[in-house]
Amino acid sequence: MVSTYQALSTCVLRTLHLSIRTTILYSLNTCVRTEIAVDALLGDPDPSILTLNTHLVAFDTEVSTYVPAPSYSLITSGLAALMDLYLLSLCTSKLENMNANGCALMQLNLLVLQQNLKNIEDGASLPNIALFLDLFTAGPEAIVARAKEHGKGFGLQGLAKEMLTQEKAKRLLELTYKERLKDERREAVVQAQRERDAQLLEISEFMY
C-alpha cells in the first residue's frame, strides 16, 4: 500500500513538472511570431504573455499550498532558464522581421515575465534573450562589435553559446536592416545593402 502511494505521488509530481513546462513552451511559441512589427508603442504586453502569467500565478499558488517545499523546488527550478533559452531559440530561428516598436513590445514581455518569475524562482532572469533584443535595439554596429570582442560563441555560456552561432548572429544583423531595405529611395537601399554585406563579412571573420 505504501509503495502504491509513493508511486502515485511520484507520478503526480512528474505530471506537475511537465505540465507547467509544456504550458510555458506553448505560450512562448504563440508570442513569437514570424513578424513582430508594431506601428505604435504598446503599453501592454502580448495577450499570450498575460495568459501565461495568469497560469503561472495560479500554478504557483496551488503547488506551494499543497506540495512540500523540497518537491516544490524540484518542480519550479529552472523555469527561467527554460524560458530564456526557448525564447532565444525562437527569435533566432522563427523571427523574420521586427521593427523598433516590435522589439520594445518583446522587451516589455520579458520584463513582465521576469517580474512574475522572481516570485516563483529566486534570482530568476532572462539574460540571453535580453541581450538579443538589446543588440537589435543598439543596431548593427553593436552586433559587429560584440562579435569582434567575443568571437565564436558571442560571449554566451552553455546552451546559449551553441544556439547563437555565426549564422544566427548574421540573422540578427540582417533583422536590423529590414526596415532600411524597405526605403522607397533606391540609393538608400543600395547603401544599406552595402553596409549590411560588409558587416556580414566582418561577423564571418570574427566568429570563424
Ranges and model annotations:
Residues 1-208:
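Extended alpha-helical "rod" scaffolds
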